[in-house]
Amino acid sequence: MSRPLARKPPQSRRQQARVNRGRRRQELMTRSQRAVRWLQPGLVVKRWVLTSGLGLLMALVGGAVWADLKPIYWILETLSWLLGTLTTVLPREFTGPILLLVGVALVLWGQSRSFGSIQQALAPDKDTVLIDALQAQSRLNRGPNIVAIGGGTGLSTLLSGLKRYSSHITAIVTVADDGGSSGVLRRELGVLPPGDIRNCLAALSTEEPLLTRLFQYRFSAGGGLEGHSFGNLFLSALTAITGNLETAITASSRVLAVQGQVVPATNVDVRLWAELENGQRIEGESNIGHAPSPIVRLGCVPSRPPALPRALEAIANADLIVLGPGSLYTSLLPNLLVPELVSAIQRSRAPRLYICNLMTQPGETDGLDVRGHLRAIEAQLASLGLNQRLFSAVLAQDDLANSALIKFYQARGAEPVLCDAKGLRKDGYDVTQAPLQGARPTSTLRHDSRSLALAVMRFYRNHKRESSQ
C-alpha cells in the first residue's frame, strides 16, 4: 500500500511565498531601472521615438482639421468633463501627481516591454539586454578612427583589445606570407595568403565564441587537411566563388560580425626578398625570418605593388595610425613596401605610433633595441627614396623583470628589447613606456591585449588633449 505524500509544512509554504515575492520585487526593480536607463543621452533612440510621436500628433491634427475640427472639439470636451469629475472626487493636489506618475510609469513600462520583445525576436539566445547593447554600441561609435598596420599574432592581439574602445577600426594586413597553411594554399590555389587576415577577422569578431573558434580551428589529421585551419579554407573557397579576396573578406566579416574592417595591404601576389649584411640575398617570407646574417634591405616582387582604395581612404580619415607589434621584417615592413600606403601615411595629420616588440627575434632582429628597430624602419624608407620620419611616437614595454621565462627565451637566442627613453626623446621621439605584458602570469612573453590597447588609447587621449591646448 503506497504511503500518502507528505504535505509541505505551512512554515515552508510561507517561506516560499516570501521568496517568490522577493523575486518579483527584484524583477520589478530591474525592469524599472532598465526603463529609466532608456532616458540616458547618447542612445540615438529617443530622438526617433519623439520624432515618431510628433509625426503621429501631426497626422491626428491634420485629420481633425480635414474633418472641420470636430474630433478636436469632442476630445477637448471629453477631457474637460473627465478632469472636472476627477477633481470633484479628489483635490487637484492629489489628482495631478497621481495621473502624472501613472502616465510616466505606463510609458516606461510599455517602452521596456516593447524593446524587450524586439530583443527576444532578434536574438532569443543571447543574454545581452537591448539597452546594454545600445549603450555599448553608442560608446563604441564615439570611438576614434584607428588604422592598425601589421600582421601575424601581434596585430591580432592589438585588435582584440582595441575593439573594446572603438567600432571604427581598420586593420591593414600584409599578404607576403608563404609558409604553413597559407603558403600551401597560395601555391596550390593561387590565392593570396589568408592566415593573417583570418587572425584579424577572428580578433575583431563580436559573434559567439564557438563560431570564432570554428574559424580558427586547425585540422590535426586527415590527408590534405592536416595543418590547415578552417578559416583559411573558408576564405580560399570564398575567394574562388567571389573572384577576389577583398569580397571574400567582406562576406566573412558579415558572418563573424566583425567590428571594423580588415583590408589587405595590396591585392597582388607579393614575393619578399632580403639583402643581408654578408652580401647574400634570400627570397621568401619564411626564409627571411631565419636569416643567417643581419638584414640590410627588404624588397618585393613586383617592386611597387598597388594599395587598395579602402586602405587609402581609411588612412586619410584616421584619427590614429599604429604600426605593430609584430615581426619587423616579415610582418611590419612588407606593408611599407606599398608606396601608396607610405604616401598616405605621410599626408595624414593623425598621430602615428610604432609599437615595439617585447623580445628580439633570433635570425631577424638579433641585438636590436628600440632605437635599432626605428633605424631599420627609417633605413627601409630611405631605400625607397623617403627620408622623412614616418613614426615619431614609440610605445615600448617597461623594463622586464628578470624571470625564469626570460631565461627560457634567452636560452633560445632572444633578448628583451631595451629602450633608451632619454636618448630617444633627445632625438625628437615621443616615447611612452607601459607594462604591456599584463599582470597575469603567462607561459609566453607576449603583449597582453587589454594592457596594450589601454596604453594605445592613453597615448591617443594625451595627444588629443595636448593638441587642443
Regions found by a protein language model. Give the residues of each.
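C-terminal functional extensions of proteins
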Residues: P4, G22-V44, G367-Q469
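N-terminal signal-anchor transmembrane helix
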Residues: S117-V147
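Short glycine/serine/threonine-rich phosphate/pyrophosphate-binding segments
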Residues: T153-L159, S181, Y329-L337
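An anion/phosphate-binding loop that grips the pyrophosphate of nucleotide cofactors and donors
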Residues: A318
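Glycine/threonine-rich flexible loop motifs
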Residues: L328-V338, A404-G413
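Charged helix-capping and loop-helix junction motifs
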Residues: N335-V342, D369-H373
